[in-house]
Amino acid sequence: MKKILIVDDEPNIVMALEYTFKKNNFEVFIARDGQEALDILKVQLPDVIILDVMMPMVDGFATLEQIKKDERLRHCKVIFLSAKNKEKHIEKGLALGANLYVVKPFSVKKLVEQVQDLIQ
């Protein structure tokens, strides 16, 4: 079973993604902010991380920087999911090492397809 870590502080998004990915046979882990995600990543090794940019404590950009510094986590596929839709934000996210940058609002169905494409 593939593992996915969803990192977002919006409960409705988390609930929708958790439900959908579980339905698609993923083991799902949830973090509400970057620090919680980094704590989970100490004990779990997901195949994919869906990462919001704007979060309390540690934002998504800083979280990805920490992930990429960790040899154990470098292989994880990362998708930014954010309302920040300016070119500079997208470029920054991809430059930090994200595989995709998806802008909110988004299609959950398409996101699942993108995740599946990344891990094949």
Predicted regions and their residues:
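Receiver (REC) domain active-site loop signature in two-component systems and cognate sites
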Residues: 55
